[in-house]
């Protein structure tokens, strides 16, 4: 069958943290319910466990976009920020019956094989005109043609993502003022910065065995590890993915940005530079001792730090998720 493309995950995705997330962090866990109907319509049968899970994979999404632009000469985008996660238990090597039940028009299925190195999965792919069988070893990615059904054969775990054709993404910003701080999980927010009087920042908070705050503020990089007391507070407030609505624009219409008050962010935290590090304080959360690579700009750092505090305190859908971490891109006036 023409149009089936298989890549090694490491060759397709050029981002080590996202690759590790795909390999290690997906698991059968509490199901997300507020999911686009097109994702729910990927019908799963046979000897398999399955779930719908959040799958914020911006670097993979961009890689699939590049491949599809080359093949179809059109843009594609994710239908949903969620994915189908399937654990196949198929000892007798018979098809499990995993397929696109309604075959949504112009949908492109992207299938990632994860799990143990020895796991092997065969995909039996069928369209109205042809059929094919391909082998999908662990950490391989198959980009299927439009409007096909597929069955699986073998033992593997699969992540199934759905894409469709799209025009360029709509702008995230409509109107902003100098007293706005804007955050989003979408990196394209940085491309919509209003003027050179604004700066960009990126925040990632990871909480597993310890809590790590990573910030890039106007090009300066900060890396901070929380003390035990602060880690306890952060880990208690780690985000619950089961409460998130989709933002597919056909079933759910969640805003893709959040606007915060600049004055509140500027006054919501404090930082102090000494010979060894930056001491950063978030009221009612705790302190961080951070390294810095770049220029020390206290006002910009305080704005970004307060945004980090807002993420820790408020469990909502705005941040992107990556395993035990969550992240946002942001812009604010200097």
From Swiss-Prot:
Induction: Expressed in the early phase of the viral replicative cycle. It holds the Pfam family Pox_A51. InterPro entries: Poxvirus_A51. Keywords: Early protein. Belongs to the orthopoxvirus OPG181 family. This is Protein OPG181. The gene is OPG181.
């Amino acid at each position: 069958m023409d149009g089936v493309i298989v890549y090694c995950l490491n060759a397709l995705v050029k981002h080590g943290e996202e690759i590790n997330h795909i390999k290690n962090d997906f698991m059968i866990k509490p199901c997300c319910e507020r999911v686009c109907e097109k994702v729910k319509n990927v019908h799963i049968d046979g000897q398999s466990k399955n779930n719908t899970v959040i799958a914020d994979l911006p670097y993979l999404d961009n890689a699939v976009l590049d491949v599809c632009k080359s093949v179809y000469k059109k843009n594609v985008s994710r239908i949903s920020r969620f994915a189908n996660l399937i654990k196949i238990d198929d000892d007798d090597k018979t098809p499990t019956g995993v397929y696109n039940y309604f075959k949504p028009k112009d949908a492109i299925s992207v299938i990632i094989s994860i799990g143990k190195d020895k796991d092997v999965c065969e995909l039996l792919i069928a369209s109205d005109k042809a059929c094919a069988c391909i082998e999908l070893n662990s950490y391989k990615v198959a980009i299927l043609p439009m409007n096909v059904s597929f069955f699986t054969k073998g033992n593997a775990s699969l992540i199934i993502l759905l894409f469709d054709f799209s025009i360029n993404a709509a702008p995230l910003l409509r109107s902003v003022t100098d007293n706005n701080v804007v955050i989003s999980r979408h990196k394209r927010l940085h491309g919509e910065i209003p003027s050179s009087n604004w700066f960009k920042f990126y925040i990632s908070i990871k909480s597993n065995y310890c809590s790590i705050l990573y910030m890039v503020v106007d090009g300066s990089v900060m890396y901070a590890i929380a003390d035990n007391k602060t880690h306890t507070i952060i880990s208690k407030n780690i985000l619950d993915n089961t409460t998130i609505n989709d933002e597919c624009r056909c079933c759910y219409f969640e805003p893709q940005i959040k606007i915060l008050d600049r004055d509140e962010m500027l006054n919501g935290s404090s930082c102090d530079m000494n010979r060894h590090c930056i001491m950063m304080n978030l009221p009612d959360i705790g302190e961080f001792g951070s390294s810095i690579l770049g220029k020390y700009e206290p006002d910009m750092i305080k704005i970004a730090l307060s945004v980090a505090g807002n993420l820790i305190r408020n469990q909502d859908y705005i941040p992107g998720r990556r395993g035990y971490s969550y992240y946002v891109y942001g812009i604010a006036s200097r």
